[in-house]
Amino acid sequence: MQAIKCVVVGDGAVGKTCLLISYTTNAFPGEYIPTVFDNYSANVMVDGRPVNLGLWDTAGQEDYDRLRPLSYPQTDVFLICFSLVSPASYENVRTKWYPEVSHHCPSTPIILVGTKLDLRDDKETMNKLSERSLRPIAYPQGLQMQKEIHAVKYLECSALTQKGLKTVFDEAIRAVLCPPAKNKSKRSCQLL
């Protein structure tokens, strides 16, 4: 069985841990507890192939900027996450997460993930955003960011409803098993 290491990064509170817990246990966690570092594992079948998917959760908070890259060596695929209802977390994909990941692992594939899809249609959330003259991130904006950061795919999901959730991890596995033609170079991740 092939083992794949998938590291999940993104701002604090965008839903990285919920994404992983909902996927691995089919249950949505209740309260928010900031992650320092966690590991999950799932045996899955993708396209008829058994895979052991090692899922590495990371802390998005700036306090952990020096610690986080310790989880990057030998990463096969990254999920860079942002919340669809947090424009700041979307901007940080460009200014923080892509630069960090591409610095440490320049040829490792990236899946860009918009989280909290269920809240994009939530009236209360929309009102809070519009009070601050903000709007949720629309699908075309996600596609634009995918191009900018050279991500293999852009996907949206909800850990709460599980809509699009399995697809995120299936596509992460496919990015490793069937790499895009342009990424034929040997994947290596160095810690400098």
From Swiss-Prot:
Propeptide: 190-192
GO cellular component term, pick one: plasma membrane
Nucleotide-binding listed as a keyword: yes
CDD domains from the UniProt entry: Rac1_like
Membrane protein topology class: Lipid-anchor
Residue numbers binding GTP: 13-18, 30-35, 116-118, 159-160
Tissue specificity: Highly expressed in respiratory tubes and coelomocytes. Moderate expression in intestinal tissue and body wall. Low expression in tube feet and longitudinal muscle.
Induction: By infection with the Gram-negative bacterium V.splendidus. Following infection, expression is significantly increased at 4 hours (approximately 15-fold above control), then decreases to control levels at 8 hours. Expression increases 2-fold above control 12 hours post infection and remains constant till 48 hours post expression. By 72 hours, expression returns to control levels.
Motif segment (Effector region): 32-40
Keywords: Cell membrane, GTP-binding, Lipoprotein, Membrane, Methylation, Nucleotide-binding, Prenylation
Domain of life: Eukaryota
Single GO BP term: innate immune response
Residues carrying lipid (S-geranylgeranyl cysteine): C189
Keyword Ribonucleoprotein: no
GO molecular function: GTP binding; GTPase activity
Modified residues annotated as Cysteine methyl ester in this record: C189
Cross-referenced InterPro entries: P-loop_NTPase, Small_GTP-bd, Small_GTPase, Small_GTPase_Rho
Location of this chain's protein in the cell: Cell membrane
Family statement: Belongs to the small GTPase superfamily. Rho family.
Function noted in UniProt: Plasma membrane-associated small GTPase which cycles between active GTP-bound and inactive GDP-bound states.
Protein name stated in the entry: Ras-related protein Rac1
Organism of origin: Stichopus japonicus
